[in-house]
Amino acid sequence: MAEIDLSPTDRAILEMLREGRCTPAYIAAEHDYSRQHVRNRLQRLVELGYVERVHKGLYELVQDPEQT
């Protein structure tokens, strides 16, 4: 996978998702981000193959982004 420049917000989201599935609202509350900002970052992480939307408003970390 090519080197991707992740923002500090992206890294914080990925760290939370390493612990398990999360909603944007939960991530936003834990890090004092707006829910919209978290949704935007999650969408980018989905597009990059790091995160998968498993249900409406529920996301999880992709175990191996190379497999997406």
What are these regions (language model features)?
Residues 49:
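Glycine-centered, phosphate/nucleic-acid-interacting loop/turn motifs that mediate DNA/RNA or nucleotide
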